[in-house]
C-alpha cells in the first residue's frame, strides 16, 4: 500500500500527508490505509479549489489555462494541509476580514464567493452515514459539508453542491480511478474495511520464523516470551510513580527520584585560567573599513579593482612595525607578509591592465605563515600496519580559560545599529492570499528593525568572505591567492558603498573532503590598540601601519592605524555554512513570529501591527546580573539576530554540547517555575555533562554566565 500511495499521488501531497501523520505521532509505514486516506482527502481538497477564481467584478469563473496576468483571486483558500498553527492563523485572519463566525474545528477550505468554510469528506461507506457523523462532530450551522464517496455518490448541506457539474465529475472520476487501481493490486478490501467512523483501525501482524526467534532473544531480562512482554507493555500506565516503574523494568536500576526545589540547583562552575581570546575568522567590533561611496570606477564589482580603489582613499600609510608580537610565531614573517602585499598591489598598478585576481609570490614568509610543507608526510597503512607500537599522537588537553569581559562587549556591539543598511528590502509583488499578506508584512517590519544592525553587517561580511575564499580554493588550488575582504552596503541617503576590511592570502587548497583544511593568513585594519586587552589578541601579531585622521566633536584627531595579522584555517563545510549565514535572519524572524503567534492566539486576532508599532511596550530580552533586561521590540529582534549570528561565528563542539545539555536543566527549572513539581535523578551527572563543555570558548563561557544569571533570577 505504501508503494502504491507514493506512485499514485503527487509527491507534494505525499509529503504533506507524512507531515500530518508525524504531527500526530503516526507512522505512514505502519498505518498505510490511513496514509492513503489522508492523501486522497488532500487531493480532493486541492481538486475542489483548482481552476476556480473570482474576477474583477467579483463573479466566480473557471480558468483552466488562460492569461496568467489576469487579475484573478483564488475562489477558495486551502486550509487543509497546512500545519496547525498556520492553519489557525489563516482561519483567524479570514474571520477578522470577513466577519464570519470562527469554527470550533479546523475546516478544509474557505469559499470567498459564498463566504463560508467548507468541510470536505471522502468516505468508503454510505455517504449519508458519514455526513451525519461529520455534522454531529462539528455542530455548526455555518460550516458547509460536502461528502464524496468512491462509488460516485455525493451529499452536501441543503443539497447545495457549491461547484459546477464538471468540476465535481473530475473529482468523482479520480476517486473511481484510485479505487480501481487499489482493487487491481488487491488493496481495496483492506482499505474499505479500515474506515471506522472518524478513526481507522491498525492491523496487528504476526511475527514468525527468524524474526520471531530474534524477538524472543532480544527481550528485556525477566520476560519469557514476546506475548508476555506485549501484555506488560499494553498494561503499562505511563503516569505512575517513576521509581516503581524503573524498578519494575530492571532489578539493576535503583534510581531515587529527588524533588527539584528552589534550593536544589547550584550555579555552573566556570573554568579558571588566563582570560579567553578572540577566535572568530574575522574581526568583529574592532574591524575598520576603508570605503568608497557611489563606486563607478572601471571594473567596479571586481574585488581586486574595488580593493585598490579603497586603498587609495587612505593617505596615512607609514613604515609598518610590530607593536604586539604573537607569542609563538616568527613575527618578522608577518611584517614581511604585509610589506609583500603592499609591494605586489603597487606592481599591479604599474601594469597596463589590472588582472582580475592576484596570486602572491611564494616567498619564505608566506610559505611559513601558510604552513607550506609543514604537514607530516602521509604513509600508506599497508606499509606500517606491522609496526608493533603504532599509536596515535598524545594530544594535550586544551588549557582552560576564564571568561573575559570583551565577549560581552562584542555581543552588545553586535546588537547595535550602524548608520548603513546591509540588506535590501525585498520588492514583493501584490499578495493574493491573506496568509502571504501577513507573512510579508511581518518580514517587512522585521527587516526594518534589523537591516541596519551590526549583526547583519557580520552576516554579509561572512557571506562575502566565505564565498570568495571557497571560490578561490576551488579555482586556484596551488596558488597563494590574495583575496580582498569586501562588503557592500547603502548609506542613510541610499548611496551605494563598498568597504574594504583587509586581505586574506590563502594557502594550498586541494580540498577533497568536506573537512580538509585550507590555511589562510588574514590581515585586517583596525583602530583598536591591542595593548589595552592583550589577552584578547593572543593569536594575533599586530602591526602599526599608518595614522588616520578622525573627525570628532573637538575637531580632527590623528589615531594610529593597526593591522591585525594571524594564521587561520577553514574547511569546505565551514565555508559552505559561512556562505549560508543569511539563514540567521530567517531563524530570528521565526522566533519573533512565534512571539507574535502567541500574542495573536491570546487576543484571537492577528497582532502583527500592534506588536511592531506599540513603541511603549517593552519585552524581555535576556538575563543579566542586574535582573531581567527589557527593551523595545526592535531591540528584541536585534538581540535574537545577534545570538543566531554568534552561534554561527563561534560554532564549535563545545557550543553544541553546552546547548544540548544546558537545555535539559533549563527545562527542569522552567517546570519548577510553572509549579509542576519536577523530580530528577543523577542531577550531578547532568551538571558534569554541561560543565565538561566549559573549557576555553568565549561564546560558550558567556552563555554559561548568562545561564547563571537566569538561575539566580528564576529561583528568587
Curated annotation (Swiss-Prot):
Residues that, per the record, bind Mn(2+) 2: 80, 108
Record's GO cellular component terms: host cell cytoplasm; host cell nucleus
GO molecular function, one term: RNA binding
InterPro entries linked: INFV_PA, PA/PA-X, PA/PA-X_sf
Gene3D superfamilies xref list: Influenza RNA-dependent RNA polymerase subunit PA, endonuclease domain (3.40.91.90)
Coiled coil: none
Compartment(s) of residence: Host cytoplasm; Host nucleus
Complex and partners: Influenza RNA polymerase is composed of three subunits: PB1, PB2 and PA. Interacts (via C-terminus) with PB1 (via N-terminus).
Protein name as annotated: Polymerase acidic protein
Origin species: Influenza A virus (strain A/Duck/Hokkaido/8/1980 H3N8)
Amino acid at each position: 500500500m505504501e508503494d502504491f500511495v507514493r506512485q499514485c499521488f503527487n509527491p507534494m501531497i505525499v509529503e504533506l500527508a507524512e507531515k500530518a501523520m508525524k504531527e500526530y505521532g503516526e507512522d505512514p509505514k505502519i498505518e498505510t490505509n490511513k496514509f492513503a486516506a489522508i492523501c486522497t482527502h488532500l487531493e480532493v481538497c486541492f481538486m475542489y479549489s483548482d481552476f476556480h477564481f473570482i474576477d474583477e467584478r467579483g463573479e466566480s469563473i473557471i480558468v483552466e489555462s488562460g492569461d496568467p496576468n489576469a487579475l484573478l483571486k483564488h475562489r477558495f483558500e486551502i486550509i487543509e494541509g497546512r500545519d496547525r498553527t498556520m492553519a489557525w492563523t489563516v482561519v483567524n485572519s479570514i474571520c477578522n476580514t470577513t466577519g464570519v463566525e470562527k469554527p470550533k474545528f479546523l475546516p478544509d477550505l474557505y469559499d470567498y464567493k459564498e463566504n463560508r468554510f467548507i468541510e470536505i469528506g471522502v468516505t468508503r461507506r454510505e455517504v449519508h452515514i458519514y455526513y451525519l457523523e461529520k455534522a454531529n462532530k462539528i455542530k455548526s450551522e455555518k460550516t458547509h459539508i460536502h461528502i464524496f464517496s468512491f462509488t460516485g455518490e455525493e451529499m452536501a448541506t441543503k443539497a447545495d453542491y457549491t461547484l459546477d457539474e464538471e468540476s465535481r465529475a473530475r473529482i468523482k472520476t479520480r476517486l473511481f480511478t484510485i479505487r480501481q487501481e487499489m482493487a487491481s493490486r488487491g488493496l481495496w478490501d483492506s482499505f474499505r474495511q479500515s474506515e471506522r467512523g472518524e478513526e481507522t483501525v491498525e492491523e496487528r501482524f504476526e511475527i514468525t520464523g527468524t524474526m520471531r526467534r530474534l524477538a524472543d532473544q532480544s527481550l528485556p531480562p525477566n520476560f519469557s516470551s514476546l506475548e508476555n512482554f506485549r501484555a506488560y507493555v499494553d498494561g503499562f500506565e505511563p503516569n505512575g510513580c517513576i521509581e516503581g516503574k524503573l524498578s519494575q523494568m530492571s532489578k539493576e536500576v535503583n534510581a531515587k527520584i529527588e524533588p527539584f526545589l528552589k534550593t536544589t540547583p547550584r550555579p555552573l562552575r566556570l573554568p579558571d585560567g588566563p582570560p579567553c581570546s578572540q577566535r572568530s575568522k574575522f574581526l568583529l567590533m574592532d574591524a575598520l573599513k576603508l570605503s568608497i561611496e557611489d563606486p563607478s570606477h572601471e571594473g567596479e564589482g571586481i574585488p581586486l579593482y574595488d580593493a585598490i580603489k579603497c586603498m587609495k582613499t587612505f593617505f596615512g600609510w607609514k613604515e609598518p612595525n610590530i607593536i604586539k608580537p604573537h607569542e609563538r610565531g616568527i613575527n618578522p614573517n608577518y611584517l614581511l607578509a604585509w610589506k609583500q602585499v603592499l609591494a605586489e598591489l603597487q606592481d599591479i598598478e604599474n601594469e597596463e591592465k589590472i588582472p582580475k585576481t592576484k596570486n602572491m609570490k611564494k616567498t619564505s614568509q608566506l610559505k611559513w605563515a601558510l604552513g607550506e610543507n609543514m604537514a607530516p608526510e602521509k604513509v600508506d597503512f599497508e606499509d606500517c600496519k606491522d609496526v608493533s607500537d603504532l599509536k596515535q599522537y598524545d594530544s594535550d588537553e586544551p588549557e582552560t580559560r576564564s571568561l573575559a569581559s570583551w565577549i560581552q562587549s562584542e555581543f552588545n556591539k553586535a546588537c547595535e545599529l550602524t548608520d548603513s543598511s546591509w540588506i535590501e528590502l525585498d520588492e514583493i509583488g501584490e499578495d493574493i492570499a491573506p496568509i502571504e499578506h501577513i507573512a510579508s508584512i511581518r518580514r517587512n517590519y522585521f527587516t526594518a528593525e534589523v537591516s541596519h544592525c551590526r549583526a547583519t553587517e557580520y552576516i554579509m561580511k561572512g557571506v562575502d568572505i566565505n564565498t570568495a575564499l571557497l571560490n578561490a580554493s576551488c579555482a586556484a588550488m596551488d596558488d597563494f591567492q590574495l583575496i580582498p575582504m569586501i562588503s557592500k552596503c547603502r548609506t542613510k541617503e541610499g548611496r551605494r558603498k563598498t568597504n574594504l576590511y583587509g586581505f586574506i592570502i590563502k594557502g594550498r587548497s586541494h580540498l577533497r573532503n568536506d573537512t580538509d583544511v585550507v590555511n589562510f593568513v588574514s590581515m585586517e585594519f583596525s583602530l583598536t590598540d591591542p595593548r589595552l586587552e592583550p589577552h584578547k589578541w593572543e593569536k594575533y601579531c599586530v602591526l602599526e601601519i599608518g595614522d588616520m585622521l578622525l573627525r570628532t566633536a573637538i575637531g580632527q584627531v590623528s589615531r594610529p592605524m593597526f593591522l591585525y595579522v594571524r594564521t587561520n584555517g577553514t574547511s569546505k563545510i565551514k565555508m559552505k555554512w559561512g556562505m549560508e549565514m543569511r539563514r540567521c535572519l530567517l531563524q530570528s524572524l521565526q522566533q519573533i513570529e512565534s512571539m507574535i503567534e502567541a500574542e495573536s492566539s491570546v487576543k484571537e486576532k492577528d497582532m502583527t501591527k500592534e506588536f511592531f508599532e506599540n513603541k511603549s511596550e517593552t519585552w524581555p530580552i535576556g538575563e543579566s546580573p542586574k535582573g531581567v533586561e527589557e527593551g523595545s521590540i526592535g531591540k528584541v529582534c536585534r538581540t535574537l539576530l545577534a545570538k543566531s549570528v554568534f552561534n554561527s561565528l563561534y560554532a564549535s563542539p563545545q557550543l553544541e554540547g553546552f546547548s544540548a545539555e544546558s537545555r535539559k536543566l533549563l527545562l527542569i527549572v522552567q517546570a519548577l517555575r510553572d509549579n509542576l513539581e519536577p523530580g530528577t535523578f543523577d542531577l550531578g551527572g547532568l551538571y558534569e555533562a554541561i560543565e565538561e563543555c566549559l573549557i576555553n570558548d568565549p561564546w560558550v563561557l558567556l552563555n554559561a554566565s548568562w545561564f547563571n544569571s537566569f538561575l539566580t533570577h528564576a529561583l528568587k
